[in-house]
Amino acid sequence: MNYVPLHVHTCWSLLDSTLDVDEYVSHLATKGFKAAAITDHNNIKGLVPFYKKAKAKGIRPIIGCELDMWNLFGFVGRITLLCKNKTGYKNLIAIVSMARSIERFKVDGRAKTYLTELSQYSEGLICLIGDLRSEVFTNAFANPDMAYNSDSEEECSILLKKNHKEEIDLVLSKYQAVFNDVFLFFDYSKLPALKVLGNAIKTSYKDYVPCNNIHYVKKEDIPIHDLIIKDQEAQDPAVDDQRIFLANYCLCHMPEKFPDGEKTFAVLDLIEDFAIEEPPMIPQFGVKDQIILDQDEYLKICCRKGYSDKFIKGNKIPEAIKCEYTERIRRELNIFQQAKISGYFLIVRDIVNYVKGRGLPIDSRGSSSGCLISYLLDISSIDPLMPDPTLDYSKDRELPFERFYNEGRNNATNVSLPDIDVDVPPSARPEIIDYIRNKYGHENVAHIITHSRFKGKGALKEAFRIIKPAENHFEIANEITKLFVDEAKISDELVELQEEDPSYGIIRWNIDNIQSVKKFYDQYKEVFDFAIRIEKLPKNESVHAAGLIVSDRPLKNSFPMTYSPKLDQMIIDVEGVDVEFLGGVKFDILGVAALEKAYQIERMINEKLKFVEYGRI
């Protein structure tokens, strides 16, 4: 291909793009692109999946973002920033986090960036300006709204200011005073106003960049994208009206020989191929505000104490199997020391001890019971070598350590973290999180964002609501979805099918395999096709139920942040699995209602009888 896509919105521009990251990268690889960008609206949520998938296909990922620019009087236009290097990447994180800060995002849910504050964050960033919502468009036309809505090139030519070049130069000079690299760009679009503006730019400027504003891959997505936008407008009048134009938004319809496409390589030449993956930022654990410098040695000390309490003072280990225990402990300690994650266990142990010290119930579940060190530290209540103490020791009954931690995943650039789920009473969770914040610093601890997605049945119901509102859509959708096979029963088959086609989902499987669903598909093809395209796309923001990131440094320097109305605080604007790729250390502290009830029952009984222990309920 003779060009680089530099202005691309994926599904992480929530409800404004049908472009799934898998689908995007797959298309890039098929068409032979060597580099491409991701530039979602006011966020970089998709940077990790895009980076990883692009790298896997041999495509250079360009990290960027489209920002809404404001001044004291309101919205003024949009710019697109691309990261030249790691410095620019860090600066973009800071800019996006400021745009979505409590002071701005809380007011009306809109991200706001001010040019006056960008000078200190401009290093390492490329600025692109010139699309439909930019100050270039607004300043070039005498009546930009009329030009935007016009279907006549002749009318738009009349509306184009005679001094449009001077007006554009004023906009460019304003941004050139902040950024070293500023490029004027325009869309090759069927929109008359953009065609007129594009011709004017080509006539007056040599250094411009053709840069279409991509929102989807397939032409079939045009009406789907249009319906999503119109549905938002119906629910929220504040959502911008957007006119959909084939050549402007659709990646697959851009020609292989894109006009002046080689000019995009002038931008690519400025961009380094830098890495964003980071090792775990585990805080140094301390006791009584004193940092313990040798985390490995302190973990050994804690393990010795646990061994003494459980197996010397407590239940004796049969002499014949002592070597099994000592060998397992040595092996686990060595693995954690090599991975440099000893501090992780010290932090979890400290949290557990704090909760127990408050007289509250706490439990860990899942694979952590396969770790002997977790048992020695009282994180887990199960001895993995003798999980059933009523039975004699047997190698076959051991809980495998590999189920808990697979050291084979570690390499020179990546260290996997353990996954210990800690369950606590919901009423105590805020207090526990406050303890963690006070110990490691409020700027170093944050919740994580999560996103609800259009799932199979829900996607179909949403499609009926939008496309067939006049019909009895709810009853029809319910009748159809009751015929669906439980997704859990075919999960392995779906994984195999998705390896060949990432967009394959539960709706298509039911159409292909359930005859009664196929009949409904023939009757409501438009609705089903809409549902298939939105299936798995993110739609709403929420807060991860358990995940908490604890770092050795202020999180705002390493992760994009956003305001959460639910918590009334800043949270990390990247999903949990992606946060770990960027060096985040996740601790799962889940409020479990059943635990609360068991604890209340214990207290009620003990008020009368005083012999029940929570751990025996």
Feature-to-residue mapping (PLM):
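Alpha-helical scaffold/interaction cores of sigma-54-like transcription cofactors
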Residues: M1-I617
